[in-house]
């Protein structure tokens, strides 16, 4: 079969079937051998995907020896790079099932040969398997062999003439480092890591920085800050957007692992640079992950929060929305007084933003703000302003956003909701008589959801008459429909 997708699915299914079989060891070994000795490369490629499942299934030494030998033969197929590519893709999985010293004698040489293949598209697949091969050696209590057989492959891949191979190694570098362990990583692989961070290809630098935070766990915060962080900081000046975006993600993952001292020394300057970055995507990545810095927010408030407040007026609506989403978090960490002095006006103005998603972002945090600031404070400082926005609004979508926000607030749990529910109810009842049908049926649905949280007297005296009137006399069919639906649900 020449269609790759069909072959791949057939191999996947065959592996599942082999794993479920109780017997048939001879037939399985025979099938793999027949495919691997076929005339067409397609059969050989399929065989490569079956070796792992077949080797696990058979138990006779002769059959296993035959499979290892056949795997080696396919790895030396000089006529067909596609076959060697298939072997390279599967060498890590195969290494995971070959036992003891046979792994060293029969599979590791295959891995090393493929990692130095003339074809770069073979090498890149082989070096991606370095982590799996190293883990197999460790699992077989052969961890000392990693220094001899895996680390040299990693070092050569980092210096490979093909950027695609270096990029493949960068993608798998963290996994390989964790497999070989902290000692080898600190002594042998940190120079490789810093080399990848300085690679002249942007794809390599971006791939390397993506998992950089995992190295703190391996080598410790102090070693990482001393040996690696200078090269990470250098990427702040990178002209490539993909690198800066990857670095902004890595920055937020590094902070919790490095601790407060290193965060204030190294991460804080990065944060300030990213929040001023010309790319909205970079700014957005930082804002969406501010919760990772929550623990140290009070310590860095003077340097970071003014920049966050500036972004509340950003021309990109996604950035403004991200600021609104972060407001409750900042309030939790900085306190009610800080919110009132610095964030309240910015937060309230979001309800009048021209973009609906920004208004929604603000409304989603209202319940959380109530939990932090208290219902009485919210009733005194926030609700009157929101009411005035509703009254002054000439744009019906703003009124809808306000109704949805207040509905969530009234439907919250605890005593706070009961304190605010009367205020909310009066505005929602006004919304039910708005001149715009969309606002009216939004209010109707809000009344339906609020009804279980209201006392019976309020439902009978205010909610039910309002819904009945709308169901009977509203000129809009949608409003009538939702009113009837709401009445049915509260009976």
Regions found by a protein language model. Name each.
Residues 1, 23-36, 61-75, 101-115, ...:
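HEAT/HEAT-like alpha-solenoid repeats
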Residues 13-20, 50-57, 90-97, 114-115, ...:
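Hydrophobic residues within the alpha-helices of tandem HEAT/HEAT-like
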Residues 357-358, 367-433:
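Eukaryotic tandem repeat interaction scaffolds
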